Amino acid sequence: MDGRLFKDELLYCEGKHKPWFRGKIHLASLVFLPVAVYYISFSNSPWVYFNLFGNILCFGVSGFYHTFEWSPSTELFMQKLDHQAISLWTVTMMTPIAFHLFPTETRVKFLTILLSTFIANSYATWTSQPSTILASSIPGTLLLFSGECWKHMDSMEWTCMLLAFAFQSSGTVAYVLSNKGYRLCGNDTIYGYHELFHTATLFAAYFVYMVNYTIAVREPRFP
């Protein structure tokens, strides 16, 4: 094989189906970057900027990969980089929670599991052995510590975290349906399940941003 991520799937340069909105949703989302930077400037937390970097990388790579035309070798690399960026974004979205809300012992346990799932999924990505379950285990790490989140988050942060999980989970379902060849509406020439996945990730990113912003601007409970 030529190292493609999904062995039985065509590349875009080989004629893979691509609705008009494919990639453009994530690319357009970058216009909100100045607003995001403005609000987190009220925080001295480096971890919130780390989360913002993850957002820029994830949506930037996704937007460029899906929107523009690439040579076969470049597209193969961009495809894996796209999935790698999603994994890193998932890590960065939870890092502020670990450093601002969790006590040291809990933080160490959380980061150990989180980084282990990230490394495992990264290896699977670059060796062309992708797994939705393995990828989902990265954000799933936070569910193991939901009791700690409940204990240390305020009501708005808790609600935003649940909404982020709801949107990301629904997006994952849409992504799986897209990979299995299901069509959302007719031939999906404009908008399909993969675009629904991209839309859901934007809502998830917004609610995660709100969680990280609010915990960063208030006094950390566990320095």
Name every feature range the model reports, one short phrase each:
Residues M1-P223:
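Multi-pass alpha-helical transmembrane bundles in non-GPCR membrane proteins
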